[in-house]
Amino acid sequence: MKNVSILGSTGSIGTQTLDVIRRNADINVVALAAGTRVSDLAEQVREFKPQLVCIGKEELVPELKTLIGDMDVKIVSGDEGLIEAATIESAEIVVTAVVGMMGITPTVEAIKAHKDIALANKETLVCAGHIIMSLAKECNVNIYPVDSEHSAIFQCLNGERRGEIEKILLTASGGPFRGKKRADLENVQLEDALKHPNWAMGRKITIDSSTMVNKGLEVMEAQWLFGVPAEKVQVIVQPQSIIHSMVEFKDGAVMAQLGSPDMRLPIQYALYYPERRKLNTERLDFYELAKITFEKPDMETFKGLKLAYEAAARGGNIPTALNAANEVAVARFLDRKIKYLDIPDIIEYAMNEVDYINNPTVEQILSTQKIVTDMIESRW
């Protein structure tokens, strides 16, 4: 029996993780943490019976208590509660599926508590990769990627030497606006940007996919996970989302991982690695598929990807500035307060305006986030 704590249990990755667990009797959920979806969290507590449950805001605790007051479960809240869920003694592995930079501190604390990490929170490595990876090595903790692309790379590298990687080929669907030019995106509406062609995801990551900022974050994530510089991570548009990523080695051989676009596969792989379990998901029919196509990404139209490579090259707290600016800009767009093309412009502004810090601490990373957030909110 494996004991699991899930941070972000009511979100897209969290609910799919619970779906995987529901189909496997040998995983026990010991902690659940969510933001504001009280009723969803209460239903999960009733089904999975964890020892501890965390709700994001303290003022929501009374509502949660009315729904699960008869249950034998400890209720905590806020940032401290999230850390308690991440470090609960009985957990062997922590699924970090919270959205945004709030995932950094609980991930750090979970590693210090010697918990393996199933990582679905990009911002943790984008902003604090230099801290996370060295700490994981020091604490002898495994980090298993949950992103479909990074899981694919991880699978391609099984039995291979990291030093023999020539480059990583990170695939992208191209999103709903593939093939469009910047002028075509002037009047994009929220509903258009939320229509991803292949994947069912949360609202924020769906917008990030449409701007290709998500792929830029994945480039930075890959450099830390696999120990390669960002310039050796090449983005390739693969519209069918069948090849989830590839690795090219020194001898010219290329390894690829293929599969139907179903997030339960990388989630299950992270939970059970190195074992593979039966998963009732759609199988690839290569006769039906007939062909797989590739395209070069348009970095002028999708400036967010270009800015991510720039942030990776500059390093320090610049990836944090990019990420923080993107979080604010996407939230503004979701609230219909800015235009779609304002998103990359806001990111570029923040990257140029923030004071550079080399090798930032967690405190400096969070300070950069606040500075950038305040800077953008005062202007937009």
Swiss-Prot record:
Cell division as UniProt keyword: no
Binding-site positions, NADPH: 10-13, 35, 121, 123, 202
Gene name tied to this protein: dxr
Catalyzed reactions per annotation: 2-C-methyl-D-erythritol 4-phosphate + NADP(+) = 1-deoxy-D-xylulose 5-phosphate + NADPH + H(+)
Listed HAMAP family: DXP_reductoisom
Keyword hit for Iron: no
InterPro entries: DXP_reductoisomerase, DXP_reductoisomerase_C, DXP_reductoisomerase_N, DXPR_C, DXPR_C_sf, NAD(P)-bd_dom_sf
Database matches in PANTHER family: 1-DEOXY-D-XYLULOSE 5-PHOSPHATE REDUCTOISOMERASE, 1-DEOXY-D-XYLULOSE 5-PHOSPHATE REDUCTOISOMERASE, CHLOROPLASTIC
One GO term of the biological process aspect: isopentenyl diphosphate biosynthetic process, methylerythritol 4-phosphate pathway involved in terpenoid biosynthetic process
Protein name in the entry: 1-deoxy-D-xylulose 5-phosphate reductoisomerase
Function summary: Catalyzes the NADPH-dependent rearrangement and reduction of 1-deoxy-D-xylulose-5-phosphate (DXP) to 2-C-methyl-D-erythritol 4-phosphate (MEP).
